[in-house]
C-alpha cells in the first residue's frame, strides 16, 4: 500500500506526482450500474414470503413494488384506480381513463419543477410522505412557490401565513389540493377532480401525481422512467 509522508502538507501534490508511474492512467470513478433487469417471472406474487392467496396485498403495502414496476407488471392505471378506491364515481372514472389514454403520463411539468421539488425535499430531511406530496404540488409553478417558500420546513407548511391574493384560479386549486393532502380537510374533494370547470387538465395531472406519490411513495416516479424507456 502506498504511503505518503507529505500528506496534509503543501508538498503533498508534488509527492503524489513523483510517486506516480510514467503514463499511468488513473482509474475512473462513478457508480457501477448493474445490467440485470427484473422480469415478470422474478416478481410473481405467489413467490413472495407474504403471499396469501385468500387476501392479496394492497399495492401500497407491497414490499416489491419498485421491482414490479421495473418488470412492467404494475401499470399506472392500476395504481390510480387503487389509489382512489371505491370513491371513483362515473364522471371521475371517465376523466381518469381519458387522461391516461391521451398521452404518456408525466409526473413533473418539466425540469424546473423536478429540480425545485428535489432540492427542497432533500433540504428538509425527514419530511413526511404527505408533506413531500404537498411539496410536489407547491413547487410545480414558480409563482406559487415564491408565495410558499418562506412558510415551510421539514415539519410542514404554515398555510395560515401564505397569501394568495391575485393568484391564477388554476394555481389556487393546486394549492388547495396540497393543503388537503398535507393537513386534511375538505378544501378540495375527490368529486371535484371529475370536472374540468373546477380542476384544469394540468392541475388534474399534478394532483393525480401527488396522490400517487402520497400513497405509494417515491417509487411511483419510476413509472415515468419506465414509460420513457418504452416510447
Give each language-model segment a name.
Residues 1-165, 187-231:
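Extended, charge-biased low-complexity segments
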Residues 171-174:
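Long, hydrophobic alpha/beta structural blocks
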Residues 182-186:
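GHKL/Bergerat-fold ATPase module
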Amino acid at each position: 500500500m502506498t504511503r505518503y509522508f507529505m500528506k496534509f502538507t503543501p508538498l503533498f501534490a508534488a509527492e503524489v506526482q513523483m510517486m506516480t508511474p510514467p503514463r499511468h492512467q488513473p482509474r475512473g470513478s462513478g457508480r457501477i450500474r448493474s445490467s440485470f433487469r427484473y422480469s415478470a417471472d422474478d416478481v410473481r406474487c405467489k413467490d413472495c414470503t407474504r403471499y396469501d392467496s385468500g387476501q392479496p396485498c394492497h399495492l401500497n403495502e407491497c414490499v416489491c413494488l419498485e421491482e414490479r414496476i421495473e418488470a412492467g407488471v404494475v401499470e399506472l392505471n392500476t395504481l390510480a384506480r387503487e389509489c382512489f378506491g371505491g370513491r371513483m364515481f362515473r364522471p371521475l372514472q371517465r376523466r381518469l381513463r381519458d387522461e391516461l389514454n391521451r398521452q404518456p403520463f408525466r409526473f413533473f411539468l418539466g425540469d424546473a419543477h423536478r429540480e425545485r421539488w428535489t432540492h427542497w425535499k432533500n433540504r428538509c430531511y425527514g419530511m413526511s410522505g404527505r408533506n413531500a406530496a404537498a411539496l410536489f404540488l407547491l413547487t410545480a409553478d414558480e409563482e406559487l412557490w415564491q408565495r410558499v417558500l418562506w412558510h415551510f420546513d421539514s415539519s410542514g407548511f404554515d398555510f395560515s401565513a401564505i397569501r394568495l391574493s391575485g393568484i391564477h384560479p388554476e394555481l389556487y386549486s393546486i394549492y388547495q389540493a396540497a393543503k388537503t393532502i398535507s393537513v386534511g380537510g375538505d378544501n378540495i374533494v375527490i368529486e371535484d377532480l371529475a370536472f374540468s370547470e373546477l380542476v384544469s387538465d394540468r392541475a388534474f395531472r399534478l394532483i393525480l401525481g401527488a396522490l400517487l406519490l402520497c400513497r405509494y411513495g417515491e417509487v411511483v416516479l419510476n413509472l415515468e422512467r419506465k414509460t420513457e424507456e418504452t416510447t
